[in-house]
Structures are given as structure tokens and as C-alpha cells.
Amino acid sequence: MAVLPQVDLGHLANRDTAFVIVGAFFAWVFVVNPIYLLYFHPLSKFPGPKFWAVTRWGVSLAIISGKSHDIILDLHKKYGPILRIAPDELAFQSVSAWNDIGGHRKPGQPEMTKEPIFNEAFKDNLLGVTTREDHSRMRRILSRGFSAATFQKQEPLLKGYVDLLLSELRKRCEGGQKLIDIQTWYSFTAFDIIGDLTFGESFGSLDSGGHHPWASLIFETTRFVILANCLKRINRAFLPVLLFITPKGFGRRLKENQQLTDAKIAKRRALGASRPDYMTAMLGNDEKGAKLSDTEITSNCTALILGGAETISSALSGTTYYLTKNPEAMAKVIEEVRSAFSSEDEITLTGTGHLKYLNAVITESLRMFPPFAGASPRQVPRGGATIAGEFIPAGTSVGIWHWSMARCPDFFTHANEFHPERWLDDPRFDNDKKDASQPFAVGPRNCIGMNLTYVELRLILARLFWNFDIKLDKSCDNWVDDMVEYFGWEKIPLMVSLTPRS
């Protein structure tokens, strides 16, 4: 009689259990969870791409592409003003949403805090600090460096750097015969000014005609931080991927950059509160006696330079681009500047504040080309909130993409056209919802440097238009369309000819 083979029933049971577990996992990931997210999740009533509703990969890939601003605008056109861009995130294209999300709150009323993972890299500075109390403390201390009285004290410093910029442009333009990448020179100027106001010394970019390694690394770091944030918001398990895509020597350069930052801060701190700059503000107390920690000082220095320099250089470049693309507007602003002053010495912070058309040009440029085109997501607090007339459950990430607001034809007549007159009570634009454009955000967490930005832009542009006639090279006709954006524009050359005023 044949002997039957022995069967390890325990092994079969274990194998069957494994198959069940694996099968259940795949059923959950690819069937059950997507069905729940699409049809039963609290956000399922809001429209958007189905793939984006079941995974964060959709919006993450859009951000990584550098074209998320265009993609989100197109999706709003297709799906409407409230757009589901991830399983737990909504994007709004609504004027009232600005205040619903970021506006001032009554005492005891919870605010919508910065989304913690997105802002993790900025948790120790004004850009991303989470709690209302810490933000208020930082803001009170830093605001002294951005007061009108401080601007007046800073004017000689600003004037010196504008003098240097104009001198370098005059030397290099060869009477209008040689093309100049003016956005690079704007960047040099912005970094030198913000470096001086933060560290007590410039980066030397205008003198050397090149970016300091510190500034160069800022550009590289920004893209890396955005990529890391996208992976973290999908799942932190993806973070090891960064090890394989990190540029060679990046970690070493980051360490060297931190050492340089520490050295610059130590050198500036040794001078004490001796200059009308940001460090003087950061070394002080608020009215309650609160201070910034050493970590917060270091982090805010980096944030001020990143936010300040990039905002100024982007705004200068965008304004120059749109004026050179619109000769009638350029002629008007040049006429205003050159007729308002009898000599260049009269072009001051106070004097340029009265240039109505120049101010309208700057405001329109910031609408057309906001320095930050994307969204800085907030988190709906416990109990939920009403945004744009819709109840949004607690824990939802919400945001407004600057680009999608500024380019929306529901808010602006000829939304994709450059018309400074829309800010000067021109009846053609009476139906514009001008509050839709908020390049510096709204509420208690709006950009602390907004007024400084306007001050610098007016001074630099007025003196540039006083001294030069400017013409855009044809190679840059599609300058804005050719760029990508990662928490700020990754700018490409803006080639112009500068002809000294005769």
C-alpha cells in the first residue's frame, strides 16, 4: 500500500493567511479606499480630477513639474471655484475665501494654522510658525525693522545700492548696443540690500557681478525643500528616495552655508542695536519682554533673505517685462517719472510715493506676476469652518493659489492683459473685483515686508526710468510662460537693451 505524502497543514495555513492579508491590502488600496474617497468622504461633494481625489500624487506631480500654477488655473476653469486637489485638500478661487482662511479672528476664535508638514522647514520663522502666540511674538519684534520711520533711516543704504546698480548697468550696456540680463542684476541688488539689512553687510554681488555661494544655495535648496514636502505629504516612507536624487555635495554645502550664516549673525550681533536694520529688531524685546531664541533669529534671517530678495527681484523683473511688452504703458510711466522731478537727487522714498501711475504699474505687475504663484495651505480647526459659503470639515487643508485668482476672468476684465489703469478708477474696469489680487496675502500673517517691497520697487524703477530707455529682446517675448515656479519663480534671463537717456 502506497504511503501518502505528509502535508504541513501549518505551512499551508500560514501561506493562505498571507494571501488573505496581501489580498485585503490591495483591495483596500485599490478598491475600498478609492470608493470611500470618491463617494463617501466628507469632501466627495467637491469636484476635481478623480485621480487627485484618491491620492496626493496628482497635485504633488503638478507641483514638482513647476507648472502647478497653470494646472490649477485650468482645473478651476473646468471644475469651478472650489476644487478638490487631494484626498484631504481643497483649493479656492473666491474673493471671500481670502478672509475666511487667513483673515483676522476674534479673541477666542481659532485661526487656521499653517499646514504643519508643508511648513515644517519654516517652523521657526514667520513663514511657517504654527501657533498664533509664537507668530504674534515674532511679528511684534520684527515689525520694528519694517516701520515707516525705519525706512527713512534706511534710505541712504538703499540709495547707495541703487547708485551701484545704475553705475554697473551704464558701464555694461555700451550705449544700448549690448544686451543685459537685467533680472540677474535685479537679483544682485535685492540680495545685497537684504543681506545688508539682515547681516550688516552685503553679499558683494553688485561689485563682483556674480551671486555669493550663500545666495546660490538658496535657489537650489528651495526646489529640494518643495520636493521633500511633496514626498512627506504623500507619505514619509518615501523620504529615503531623496537620498538617491540629492545633488552631489548638497549636504556639505548646506553645512557650510549654515556655518557662514552663524558667522555672519555672530559678527552682526557684536555690533549690537547700532543700525536701523532687521537684526536690531530681532535682538530687542516686544512690549511684553519676550525675545527671539537663537534658533528663531537664525531661521528668520534665512526667511527674510529668501522672502525679501526673491520678492523684490521677481517684482522688478515682472514689472520690467510687462512694461517692455506694453510700450504705451512704458511711455506713460517714463513721462510721469521724468516730469515729476527736476533732478535725479529729488527721486526719494517720499517723492516716489506720489507717482500714481508708477504705483498702478507695480500693483498691476504684482497681479500679473505674483512673486509666489502657488498656495500656502492652512488647516481647518476643530469644529470646521465656513469658506466661500461652504462648510469645510476640521482637518482639511485649504489654500488659494495666487495665480488662479489674479488670472480669473470672473474677477478681472481682460485678466490676461496688462492694464495699470484698472487701479486708477478707469471705468472700463469698474466691475473688477480688485481684492481678488493679494500678492502679499491677507490678515495677521500677511507679508511683513509688503511696504518695504513697494518702497524699494518705486525707488529702483523710478531711477532706472530716469536714466535709461529700455527695450526687450525678442528672445524673451514669452519670458513668463517659459518659467517654472517652486515656492517662487526659477527665473530665466530677461535680456534687454538699455539706452542711456540723452
Swiss-Prot record:
Record note on biotechnological use: Hypothemycin is an antifungal agent that exhibits excellent activity against Peronophythora litchii, which could be helpful for the storage of harvest litchi fruit. Hypothemycin is a strong inhibitor of a subset of MAP kinases such as human ERK2. It can therefore be used as an anti-cancer drug thanks to its inhibitory activity of Ras-mediated cellular signals. It can also inhibit Trypanosoma brucei kinase TbCLK1 which is a good candidate as a therapeutic target for African trypanosomiasis. Finally, hypothemycin also has inhibitor activity of T cell activation.
Enzyme kind, highest EC tier: oxidoreductase
Entry's Gene Ontology cellular component terms: membrane
Name the UniProt record assigns to this protein: Cytochrome P450 monooxygenase hmp1
InterPro entries in the cross-refs: Cyt_P450, Cyt_P450_E_grp-I, Cyt_P450_sf, Cytochrome_P450_monoxygenase
Mode of membrane association: Single-pass membrane protein
One GO MF term: iron ion binding
Keyword RNA-binding found: no
Entry similarity comment: Belongs to the cytochrome P450 family.
Iron is among the record's keywords: yes
EC nos: 1.-.-.-
